[in-house]
A protein has these predicted regions:
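Short, flexible active-site-adjacent loop segments at beta-strand->alpha-helix junctions, enriched
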Residues: 68, 113-115, 133, 151
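Conserved catalytic-core motifs of GNAT/GCN5-like acyltransferases
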Residues: 110, 123, 128-145
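Acetyl-CoA-dependent GNAT
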Residues: 3-6, 10-81, 92-94, 98, ...
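Acidic, amphipathic alpha-helical patches
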Residues: 38, 118, 133
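Conserved glycine-rich acetyl-CoA-binding loop
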Residues: 79-93, 102, 106, 112-120, ...
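Acyl-donor (CoA/ACP) binding surface of acyl/acetyltransferases
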Residues: 82-85, 89, 134-136, 143-145, ...
């Protein structure tokens, strides 16, 4: 696929077209979310989704919740056959830039300790570990790593730092 056709489109959960909802519901199964949990999330006022699209095909997405100046990244997903190509980093950078310009100052996330690829992605993006919750996840048992990134605009040109 030609990267010049990729675009990131933001949606609130309620705005998501049903076809995109179905893709997200399927992707969320990788995070052990069932269909009811995904559909409930679509209805939350604070739920937002950033979809990475190639024309009308969803390549990946970020799902988050925001309250005041904080956001929690709940879902960062790239299709399995497209991983390792830098799309996750590009999508994450785009989302963080958007959040910064909207006045979000604290971004949190939680990731399985065993998910080395995701941990590396988040560390490269400037997230730092706050705490590790031992044996937090089940099936399989794994520790949860809670991470945070502080967002701020630099004085130069309003760029995120």
């Amino acid at each position: 696929m030609d990267s010049k056709h990729y675009q990131v489109v933001p949606f609130t959960g309620a705005q998501l077209p049903e076809a995109f909802r179905q893709v997200i519901i399927e992707g969320n199964q990788a995070f052990h979310w069932n269909e009811a949990q995904s559909r409930d999330d679509f209805q939350l006022d604070q739920a937002e989704y950033y979809l990475l699209l190639d024309h009308d095909q969803v390549l990946g997405y970020v799902g988050l919740h925001h309250v005041l100046d904080e956001a929690t990244l709940n879902l960062v997903y790239i299709q399995a056959d497209l991983r390792g190509q830098g799309l996750g980093r590009q999508l994450l950078d785009f989302v963080l830039n958007q959040l910064t310009h909207r006045g979000i100052r604290h971004v949190f996330l939680e990731v399985r300790q065993a998910n080395a690829a995701a941990l590396g992605l988040y560390q490269q993006a400037g997230f730092e570990t706050l705490i590790v919750r031992p044996r937090y996840y089940q099936h399989p048992v794994d520790d949860a790593v809670i991470m945070q990134k502080m967002l701020s605009l630099s004085e130069k040109e309003g760029e995120p730092s």
